[in-house]
């Protein structure tokens, strides 16, 4: 376990004020868990990717309920800077991204819990995640490239996971990240 001097973070939380012309987010300073929970890691966020969904949630247009005043965004890439005492899969310096649906880790679970909707998102300078809810990133991607992986990759996989062997898939618009992942996975 590494001890870190980071005890607080800056994060962008929704105001949940949907009046036209009012701010939709506010920058807040808030405490981080100290010590880090035993199975968790502290991540320094290097890049966050914005999706249409993020603007939709901030503007009150999400069709499902969201956590009040939650932190926005579900795609990020960062570096592990501290680990809890029971963490086995990660070390300080690992490049990681959070799993977007934290209740559906293997793809076989039936529950759902989406970052930035059902729980806080990643638009912060530091985030804490259980080690089972993050993935290692390839070293050949820069931080910005890596930050688009979580949602686009999961969306592509979700679209393909129930397609049977010998079935065809039509992929339109090969210029967007989700389309590229579908092409690669299929």
Task: Say what each PLM segment does.
Residues 128-136:
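Structured surface patches comprising rigid loops and adjacent beta-strands/short helices at the edges
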Residues 1-22, 29:
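Eukaryotic N-terminal low-complexity, Ser/Thr- and Lys/Arg-rich leader segments
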Residues 94-95, 126, 168:
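Residue-level marker of beta-strand positions
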Residues 53-59, 107:
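Cytochrome P450 core scaffold surrounding the K-helix E-X-X-R motif
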Residues 103-111:
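Short, Lys/Arg- and Gly-enriched loop/turn segments at beta-strand edges
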